[in-house]
Amino acid sequence: MGQFEQLDQLLETQDGMLRTAQVVSAGISKPVFYDYVHSRELERVAHGIYLSKDAWVDAMYLLHLRVEQAVFSHETALFFHDLTDREPLEYTVTVKTGYNPSKLKAEGVQVFTIKAELHGVGLTTAQTPFGHTVPVYDLERTICDLLRSRNNMEMQTFQGALKMYARRKDKDLRTLMRYAGMFRVEKILRQYLELSLIHISEPTRQAEIS
């Protein structure tokens, strides 16, 4: 099998997307790959990432490939966790403090920054509508993020997410209170939890804080 045929197969298995690093790992040199890109008229959509003309673009996965430290958060995390009925009009991610978000912001991505030691708190993964795995914050981290940014989002979205979380059987109040302490939103969280009709007894609260 020739190298172009090998690349054709790889392109098919990767749903029309190829990455330079992936191709090199498969034993194909960059010059050969670039000849292939020109021959097959692949589109360069980001550094080291190429798409075929008929590829369905998974924008969330592409964003993840471009900026690996970007974690889907806030309203976008609500979408992944079924805490909103609306698909996000723009993606929201969180990156470590020090990363320059100007390019992402110019593309319409809402970017939050957080110090490095808190960036990985609540980090998990989820599947995009196209079936790709991307990083996203868990339910409890998402609630804390919403509390921290509540003045920058629609009150209806914020309150709706809290009410839906309150009804979730998989909610973890102990973890939620632990995160709230780390992000310094514990006091305001208790107020909103009470409004959402979640009643935590005082002994349980003390156990969750400790």
Where do the PLM segments sit?
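Short alpha-helical segments that sit at the start of domains
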Residues: 1-5
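Nucleic-acid-binding surface
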Residues: 6, 15-22, 26, 32, ...
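Glycine-centered, phosphate/nucleic-acid-interacting loop/turn motifs that mediate DNA/RNA or nucleotide
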Residues: 40
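Single conserved hydrophobic/aromatic residue that forms the stacking wall/gate
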Residues: 198-210
